[in-house]
Amino acid sequence: LLDEIEARNDFVLLLADPEPTPWTRRVSRHCDELLLLADAQAEPAIHPIEENCLLRRAPLAEAAEILVLLHPEGTQCPRGTQQWLDRRPVADHVHVRPALDRDMARLARIQSRTAVGLVLAGGGARGFAHLGIYRALQEEGV
């Protein structure tokens, strides 16, 4: 059934159980990418699901593991990220404030491969022009 659903859709989101269960193990074996959601204010200890379903996965499981650190709405500058990354072999990580629509939209763009990156170079007066470009892009929701 999962193969049929995947054949008909570009993206399929499977939600694992909050505890290690047969469904959670199946999800961890079947997916192309795993989003590990974690409260950034919690201790960065390995969760039982990570221990049972991810760290013990078969070597052929090629799913990229992405750590999504969830922050309170008022967080300006995330801290303690390295403690999370030191404990788990993830392919990437992203910081998200779930209360902010723009953060959730950014996560959706990243996952759907439609994210936009911005690279600016130069200094002096160009730096002020860069700020203007950045603000204009933000105002347009890019």
Model-based region annotation:
Residues 1-11, 19-142:
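Patatin-like phospholipase
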